[in-house]
Amino acid sequence: MNIDDVLWKEAGCSTELDYIEQTSWLLFLKYLDDLEAEKVMEAELAGKSYERIIAKEYQWDQWAVPKNAQGEFDHNNALTGDDLIDFVNDKLFRYLRGLKDRATGPDTLEYKISEIFGEIKNKFSSGYSLRDALEHIDSLSFGLQEEKHE
C-alpha cells in the first residue's frame, strides 16, 4: 500500500489536487524535521548550538511518529483516530499559522511556513488514515543526497 491508496480511501480527499495538497504538507513537515535535525548535528559538531524553528511538541518525531528508546515507532505514545485529527486541526496547524508572529520579517522561514499553512486545510477526516500516511512518509529519509531525489 502507498500514500495514494491511503488517500483514495479518505473521504475528505476526492481529487488528485487533494492528494497532492495533503501529501505535500506531510512531506514538507517531514523534510523540515530532517533538515532541522541535520542542522542540530552540524552545530553540535562545530561546538555551537542551533535553535529549531519548530517547538518540540510540534516536531515530527513528537507528534507524527514518536519513537521509543530503541528508535522504533512507539505505538503506545502515538496519537491516532480522533485524537490525531484534533491535534493536527486544533494545535499543529494553529501553531504553524502563528509562526509569523515570532518571525523577524517576511523573508524568514517562520513567516513563509506560516503563510503556507494559512492556506492549507487538513482534509483527512480519519485519524487512522492519517496515521497510515504518516508512517509511509516517515519511512522516507531526506538526509542523504541520493534520497532527496526519490
Language-model features, listed with the residues they occupy:
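Non-catalytic, mostly N-terminal accessory regions of nucleic-acid modification and defense proteins
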Residues: 1-150
